[in-house]
Amino acid sequence: MKKVFIVAYGVVAYTVFLGAFLYAIAFVGNFLVSKSIDSGTENDLTMSVIINALLLGLFAVQHSVMARPAFKSWWVKIVGTASERSTYVLLSSLALLLLYWQWQPLRAVIWSTENETVVYALWGVFGFGWLIVFLSTLMINHFELFGLKQIYENLKGIDSQPPAFQAKLLYGFVRHPIMVGFIIAFWATPHMSLGHLIFALETTAYIVIAVAAFEEKDLMKAIGQEYEDYQKKVPMFIPFTK
């Protein structure tokens, strides 16, 4: 019964993640949803900037702290190995949903174009960024990344093995294609508001700092010389720079 409960929990966590991920596309793109990055009542500039920074900061702290090996080794003693990743995914998704809900719009225009060719090109780049994100998860192990593999192995009584390091397809061009996809999607828009600009700047800064200061170090410790060799051959974010 406990294993079945963990499976149900993992499926719920993945479903919430999927909803949060799909909503992110509409939220940043300002379409299909009633609450997007530029919708809602515009309030005091200073207070809006502070609230938005706190929302992004909450997500950043949760997302980074819970991903660190030291935290995970303690956390699995509480939630169990099988549901650790699902819990991380669920809490990250809830932090995002809170951000969507409480985000304060700042609609001052930074840039805007009505040139049809430019508009279509920017929407194409926007979609391309999200496609990179999705495809990059498949090039490692999408189901392990979001906790489904762990709950399946627990249900079947399979000993979980650490994933083997591999650098195929997009990972042969940059070391962090998922993050590159997010950055592209966050910046590609035919209409950049002040709120959208702040979102893009702060998320880009977070991605660069989190990857350089934490993720890369954790990967070096976990993988060792093979990852060091990979670092020498493949750039972090910008293709063809090595």
Label each residue range with its predicted role.
Residues 1-14, 85:
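Alpha-helical transmembrane segments and their helix-start/interface "positive-inside/aromatic belt" motifs
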Residues 14-33:
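Alpha-helical transmembrane segments of multi-pass membrane proteins
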Residues 23-26, 46, 55, 132, ...:
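Hydrophobic transmembrane alpha-helices
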Residues 30-42, 72-76, 104-115:
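Membrane-interface helix termini and inter-helical loops of multi-pass transporters
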Residues 39-47, 74-91, 156-160:
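Juxtamembrane helix-capping/reentrant segments at transmembrane boundaries
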Residues 43-57, 118-137:
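Alpha-helical transmembrane segments
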Residues 61-78:
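Membrane-helix interface/capping segments
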Residues 148-162:
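Juxtamembrane inter-helical linkers in multi-pass membrane proteins
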